[in-house]
């Protein structure tokens, strides 16, 4: 079952904002359901809400409890723009597949915003443009090529040369791609809101409950838990975030460490349109504003997951992030009010793995890796819901384990 990781340390900025309480129960006896969701972070919450909306009986378990894993560490830049540029992704998986992956990501962000509005979840959602700044991976000429590739795929994008970039946003860089259709939000409030909607539809939430073994057959899946009760379901959904289970193919993932800071509230110093900002660099810097005018900045990713080493770097990494943010926006007070670190998963292409695990058709896994974890969780909720209903999402093969045995890279906390 899940390999245990301390997914975050430090003090994430979301601790400054109260999220609704999500009541859970103790698992004292065996349980049955149509679907068992293992994990009550953002991915598990989206799946539980979608499945209960479809009329399925759902049980959710988590070894910590709701909102206590990597969800609290995400910076929640909900972008459709995939970590891997469209031009690069096309070389990896083919032009048509790359374009469809980008279009589906864009649709997912739109669908998520619509679902949040439909459910009246107060998660401080704001719509924002994004700026993809020239960096070490893509310079100005490559950004122009990327802009044209997006347009050919039907995705609106505008290249900004240095002068209009500085005039419009006050940023001194060699160029940028301006895009629209992204959102920012409070991930804890969203997760709590989705779980509460699932509860209203009679979902059963148990925590702390740790799954120890999974045994699947042609007809059902039986999950044993620490403390003895078992849960029997027609389908099991693994939404364990970056605590990866032994049943998941080893080629599917790599876990890295990343860091983030948040400043004091300074709404008068926020740049125009509160655009989401990220760099065409590896590792890349990214920044967003909160609803009350704090600035969140993250990056500095490193390829290791040792908790002690990761946590020991919080102070130094925070200073580096503050300096980089200050170079981007000299008028900001970049001193951190909050600083934290987390462990997050990556893939070479920047695309997630979603769907049935090879050889285990009743066990679905949701792995929304990279800088698009929340958008990919929305895609997962759509693909998994269709699969459990007995149909197939038209884009399921793009993200299936059996379709892509990837090399692994690319990163981010967002």
Summary of predicted features, one role per range:
Residues 1-35:
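Extreme N-terminal leader/targeting segments of oxidoreductases
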Residues 33-60:
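N-terminal Rossmann-like FAD-binding beta1-loop-alpha1 element of flavoenzymes
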Residues 148-149, 176-234:
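Helical element adjacent to the flavin cofactor pocket in flavoenzyme catalytic cores
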Residues 89-197:
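Rossmann-like flavin
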Residues 310-311, 326-414:
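C-terminal catalytic lobe of FAD-dependent flavoproteins
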Residues 38, 80, 238-239:
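Redox-cofactor binding/interface segments in oxidoreductases and associated redox assembly factors
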Residues 53-73:
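Glycine-rich FAD pyrophosphate-binding loop
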Residues 110, 118-126, 230-361:
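Active-site substrate-recognition segment that forms the wall
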């Amino acid at each position: 079952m899940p390999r245990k990781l301390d997914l975050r340390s430090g003090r994430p900025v979301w601790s400054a904002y109260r999220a609704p309480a999500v009541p859970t129960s103790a698992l004292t006896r065996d349980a049955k359901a149509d679907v068992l969701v293992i994990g009550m972070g953002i991915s598990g919450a989206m799946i539980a809400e979608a499945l209960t909306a479809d009329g399925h009986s759902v049980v959710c378990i988590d070894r910590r409890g709701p909102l206590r894993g990597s969800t609290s560490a995400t910076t929640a830049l909900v972008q459709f723009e995939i970590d891997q540029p469209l031009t690069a992704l096309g070389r990896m998986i083919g032009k048509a597949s790359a374009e469809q992956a980008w279009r589906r990501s864009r649709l997912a962000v739109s669908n998520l915003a619509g679902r949040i509005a439909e459910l009246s979840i107060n998660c401080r959602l704001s719509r924002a443009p994004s700026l993809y700044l020239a960096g070490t991976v893509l310079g100005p000429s490559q950004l122009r090529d990327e802009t044209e590739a997006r347009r050919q795929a039907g995705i609106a994008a505008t290249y900004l040369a240095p002068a209009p970039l500085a005039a419009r946003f006050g940023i001194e860089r060699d160029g940028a791609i301006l895009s629209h259709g992204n959102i920012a939000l409070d991930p804890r409030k969203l997760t709590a809101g989705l779980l509460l909607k699932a509860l209203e539809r009679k979902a059963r939430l148990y925590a702390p409950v740790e799954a120890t073994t999974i045994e699947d057959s042609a007809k059902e899946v039986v999950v044993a838990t620490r403390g003895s009760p078992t849960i029997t379901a027609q389908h099991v959904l693994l939404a364990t975030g970056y605590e990866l289970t032994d049943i998941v193919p080893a080629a599917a993932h790599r876990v890295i460490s990343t860091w983030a800071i948040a400043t004091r509230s300074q709404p008068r110093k926020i740049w125009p349109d509160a655009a989401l900002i990220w760099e065409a660099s590896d590792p890349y810097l990214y920044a967003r504003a909160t609803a009350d005018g704090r600035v969140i900045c993250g990056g500095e990713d490193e390829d290791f997951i040792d908790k002690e080493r990761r946590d020991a770097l919080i102070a130094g990494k925070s200073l580096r992030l503050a300096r980089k943010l200050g170079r981007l926006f000299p008028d900001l007070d970049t001193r951190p009010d909050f600083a934290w670190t987390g462990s997050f998963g990556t893939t070479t292409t920047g695309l997630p793995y979603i769907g049935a695990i090879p050889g285990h058709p009743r066990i679905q896994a949701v792995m929304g890796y990279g800088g698009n974890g929340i958008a990919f969780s929305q895609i997962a909720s759509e693909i998994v819901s269709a699969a459990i209903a007995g149909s197939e999402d038209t884009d399921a093969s793009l993200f299936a384990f059996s379709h892509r045995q990837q090399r692994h890279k690319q990163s981010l906390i967002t």
